[in-house]
């Protein structure tokens, strides 16, 4: 009986993983102009996190506390996924009671997304070098962070992109600064 229950649970997990993978692939192939909404991006993140929790045995908790009124803002597709991936692989993986919290606030004509994890912190100089594109840092790790930062700066200018919150002592936090722009399909 136990063996049958194990298999049934395995099938359920396989079904969940395939559904999450389908959600991710749908996001990839349905995106024609490279832009999406914060709401769609957070749905993609949830699917990605579901897969990673299956992979690592739910060793961390994920919380999305972005206010729904910000869900209609435009964001380049796959902006948050590499940051959350970094938080999982370099922050909370192997940490007891690891947490990743994604939040956002409006700030003047911009909005800022925060990705915080309570796991391992990082060296300020290494992160700054990585975000600037220092070759020796990109070769080791963080190519996703570098790519996201570069893409945001190219799209919106030097005042936008990733900002490392150096004041966090227990954990790691990256801010994503973006201009407020509601997607054309959501404008009323």
Across the structure, where does each feature detected by a protein language model lie?
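Two-component histidine phosphotransfer core
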Residues: 1-165, 172-175
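C-terminal end segment of the histidine kinase catalytic
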Residues: 167-188
